[in-house]
UniProtKB/Swiss-Prot annotation:
Location relative to the cell: Plastid, Chloroplast thylakoid lumen
Active-site residue list: C112
Organelle transit peptide: 1-66
Natural source organism: Oryza sativa subsp. japonica (Rice)
Record-given protein name: Peroxiredoxin Q, chloroplastic
UniProt subunit comment: Monomer.
Function summary: Thiol-specific peroxidase that catalyzes the reduction of hydrogen peroxide and organic hydroperoxides to water and alcohols, respectively. Plays a role in cell protection against oxidative stress by detoxifying peroxides.
Protein EC: 1.11.1.24
InterPro entries linked to this entry: AhpC/TSA, Peroxiredoxin_BCP/PrxQ, Thioredoxin-like_sf, Thioredoxin_domain
One of the record's GO molecular function terms: thioredoxin peroxidase activity
UniProt-listed PROSITE patterns: THIOREDOXIN_2
Disulfide bonds: C112-C117
Stored Gene3D superfamilies: Glutaredoxin (3.40.30.10)
Length: 217
């Protein structure tokens, strides 16, 4: 009987190791990586996209609000900028006739060159409508002069360095604020905005759309 008791006790001594090996080990292993991840900042990679995504819509949202600065039916704000020859030109100078003011990203870029040449090729139609065409970008006067000469542009190019007028008029940027917007305004002879057209990636469409409006004034 003494031997039977001793053999019965031996299995009971083996039970504690079994309990230690199964429940406690998974629990620490599951908890340790997550806390370590927070301490080491390993989760920063997952949290970084969240603010980035939130920031992008906020810039586009600001642009939409700014876009309301000059709207259809409002009087276009006057400005004075330097032309391709360095002369000061004011918008008020053209009062008494329709004016097409088109903002574009930059000289010598593919889309802007197409747009400028399309305005050039249809310039006689604008003259028949009694309208003046003015192109505005952030390039300096020297860049405008070269651009105008190279493509034989018959209309005025104005230098808005620092994009002051662009901001005052509320021209919205594209690609989350990284690309200056391409926007055209049609003003009647009293300087009132009759039409606003925005199309960054089809620059030549600006010409046909603005001519339709001019011919109806």
């Amino acid at each position: 009987m003494a031997f039977a008791v001793s053999t019965a006790c031996r299995p009971s001594l083996l039970l504690p190791p079994r309990q230690r090996s199964s429940p406690p080990r998974p629990r620490p292993l599951l908890c340790t990586p997550s806390t370590a991840a927070f301490r080491r900042g390993a989760l920063s990679a997952t949290t970084t996209p969240t603010p980035a995504r939130a920031a992008l819509p906020s810039t586009t949202g600001r642009n939409r609000i700014v876009c309301g600065k000059v709207s259809k039916g409002s009087a276009a704000p006057n400005f004075t900028l330097r032309d391709q020859d360095g002369r000061a030109v004011s918008l008020s100078k053209f009062k008494g006739r329709p004016v097409v003011v088109y903002f574009y990203p930059a000289d010598e870029t593919p889309g802007c060159t197409k747009q400028a040449c399309a305005f050039r090729d249809s310039y006689e139609k604008f003259k028949k409508a009694g309208a003046e065409v003015i192109g505005i970008s952030g390039d300096d006067a020297a860049s405008h002069k070269e651009f105008k000469k190279k493509y034989k542009l018959p209309f005025t190019l104005l230098s808005d360095e620092g994009n002051k007028v662009r901001k005052e008029w509320g021209v919205p940027a594209d690609l989350f604020g990284t690309l200056p917007g391409r926007q055209t305004y049609v003003l009647d002879k009293n300087g009132v905005v009759q039409y606003i057209y925005n199309n960054q990636f089809q620059p030549e469409k600006h010409i046909g759309e603005t001519l339709k409006i001019l011919q109806s004034l």
